[in-house]
Amino acid sequence: MKEFKRYLELDRSQQHDFVYPLLFQEYIYVLAHDHGLNRSILLENADYDNKFSLLIVKRLITQMDQQNHLIFSPNDSNQNPFLGHNTNLYSQMILEGFAVVVEIPFSLRLISSLEGKETVKSHKLRSIHSIFPFLEDKFSRLNYVLDILIPHSIHLEILVQTLRYWVKDASSLHLLRFFLHEYRNWNTRITPKESSFSFSKRNQRFFLFLYNFHVCESESIFVFLRNQSSHLRSISSGTFLERIYFYGKIEHFVKVFTKDFQDILWLFKDPFMHYVRYQGNSILASKGTSLLMNKWKYYLVNFWQCYFYMWCQPGRIQINQLSNHSLDFLGYLSSVRLNPSMVRSQMLENSFLIGNAIKKFDTIVPIIPLIGSLYKAKFCNVLGHPVSKPVWADLSDSDIIDRFGRIYRNLSHYHTGSLKKTSLYRIKYILRLSCARTLARKHRSTVRAFLKRLGSELLEEFFTEEEQVFDLTFQETYSTSQGLSRGRIWYLDIICINDLANHE
């Protein structure tokens, strides 16, 4: 953030909404390509002179402005004689700079709040790590949960129209439309994982900005309703979610519900309502009744249809009772199970046995999704039988063993939040045998002959159990007489592990 302030030198009170002139500043493209902010932006570089010329930027934007986007020819060439270079290449690079520029208004609002202009309540700024204490402390006290797949099929014009409430620079928004027309994907819909954007692979920053902005907008309804129902303005919400234009959308809600908008706010005053999002999924959990959750579902479906103008299938929102269903979230199967207990009550000469059921939060490791991930990575077949990994056969023996061992250690590390880890023994078996078959394939031998020659202990040391690592780490903290508690452990780095740990 300091680098942005030093290079941009914007007057936030007047100029932070006018970002279009920044596209003609060459250091923006240095920022976009991570050339480093400590060195001079005027450093001579042949690559830099050819790709980040101010003249090229001006010419390309002028050409895009004069182009007739209603006429498309399949024989159009990427080579433009006016520019003398590859137009698509320069469009890619300008879009990368645009991704940096369009983030500036959001960054400046955050900086102003952190500098003390607005007081930010720490409990309002939650990260992904706040999910773990929520599961531990709150989950067992809730009754119902809405399992939501965040809608993502949204037309790009809707995003541009919504973005103009944040960025009030019309020139920048027009340029964004030009870029989308340039790639002839104006009728494309945004998706979180697979996109038909021709620039999505090279411009991940811009693509992620659009998707995260869309998610931010879809979540804004929760902040708006909470503020309206409780009549308390959340200071931190003003930093991230400016709801100015939401008041103009109240008419849509009135038409949908055929009642006055204020009459339905009582539905959202539940103090036990919790909202959690992780990747493309979110949950809305409550201590309320099934009727309340159905009304929430009905409200969300209509909100997405009226505000984003997109069809949201009701099946994307599942209502589950925690006592009867397990929630597939964060790579775990989480549930609230009843732990029965009997209490003897003595009154004078009579004694009674009283049954008492205690709610307990429980997490298990889902074996089927894990095997499915191993199957996609070609460590086993669809039934879970280990197979060799031919693409790794050219590596050294130590590299092959290290790769297999690292995958298992990551999976074991990820699932330390579960008290029942029996499923991991199956995963360990698959990876160990797949590793042995890969080594045997490399040495043109059988698995039995290979292990007999080198010994099965060769693989054991690379598949260290997470519990053994935990013992080695904390053996000095706990006395051996008391033993080490085998409780649930949530590591804060689990979101950075490989795709297998995330079941993708």
From Swiss-Prot:
GO molecular function annotation: RNA binding
Biological function: Usually encoded in the trnK tRNA gene intron. Probably assists in splicing its own and other chloroplast group II introns.
Superkingdom of the source species: Eukaryota
Source organism: Actinidia deliciosa
Biological process according to GO: mRNA processing; RNA splicing; tRNA processing
Chief location of this protein within or outside the cell: plastid
Subcellular location: Plastid, Chloroplast
Similarity section: Belongs to the intron maturase 2 family. MatK subfamily.
Keywords per UniProt: Chloroplast, mRNA processing, Plastid, RNA-binding, tRNA processing
Name of this protein: Maturase K
An example Gene Ontology CC term for this record: chloroplast
